[in-house]
Amino acid sequence: MAIKMALLTPDDLININMQLQKADSAVQEVTGLDIKGICKALYGTFSSSEKVGIVPVTSGNGIIGNFSASLHAITQYFGFDSFVTDMPDVSGYYEAVQNGAEIILMADDRTFLAHNLKNGKMANNQPCTGIIYAEIASRYLKADSKDVLVVGLGKVGFPGAEHLVQKDFRVYGYDADETLLERATSNLGIIPFDPANPKKFSIIFEATPCANTIPEAVLSENCVLSTPGIPCAISEELRDKYEVQLIAEPLGIGTASMLYSVL
């Protein structure tokens, strides 16, 4: 049976521009680069105001309120020339192509994709999100070692963990699903993390749809926590106590990763 994505709600996307600006500042403070700079470094690509057609999709649970408008705001923020089609689904796709879209953005319950019609490149949100959040974590300027804790090894976390392994980090991984943990251990050679014998980390990447997955025992002072997970992986109390550098935003960072990956 196909696994659905964790779905955003309209409340997650309120004030998306403000959320994105805040995240951009946080990323720059942690890495020395803004989100666009991270994307350029990660993919070696540059934006030239490509025209992006955003197509609403009604299948499954239907259109998420604010989703298309949020994608429009996000793509504009990163310098793309975007528009939302009047029609959804196949009619919307046709409309986008007829109106000169070079890149299509569209999502149903299982897949959020970017498709560059000029070069044929296609990107899925889940791996792109995992990779960019892992990349941000890996660039933490104040990291005290190459040890990284990855919590969540599913469709977002596994690609992020793989990216960190490829960058020669020593990756400790944990997932409540033992099958996912065993797969990551076997395929990536990561070190299984045992919550009963914790250690502290200055770099943490989290990718789960669960709240408060990061226990106090793994937090070091001023560590970075890079997480696309909703709800937030850490309590406000622990974040304040350890002055955690939190990188968390619902949609924009992953979308930027998708777009730059298909340029």
Swiss-Prot record:
Binding-site list for L-pyrrolysine: L8, V57, I64, A107
Enzymatic class: oxidoreductase
Pfam families reported for this sequence: PylD_N
Keyword Oxidoreductase: yes
EC number: 1.4.1.-
Reaction it catalyzes: (3R)-3-methyl-D-ornithyl-N(6)-L-lysine + NAD(+) = L-pyrrolysine + NH4(+) + NADH + 2 H(+)
Job description of the protein: Catalyzes the ultimate step of the pyrrolysine biosynthesis pathway by converting the isopeptide (3R)-3-methyl-D-ornithyl-N(6)-L-lysine to the 22nd proteinogenic amino acid. Is able to use surrogate substrates such as (3R)-D-ornithyl-N(6)-L-lysine in vitro.
Protein family per UniProt: Belongs to the PylD family.
Matches recorded under NCBIfam families: pyrrolys_PylD (TIGR03911)
Protein name: Pyrrolysine synthase
Source organism per UniProt: Methanosarcina barkeri (strain Fusaro / DSM 804)
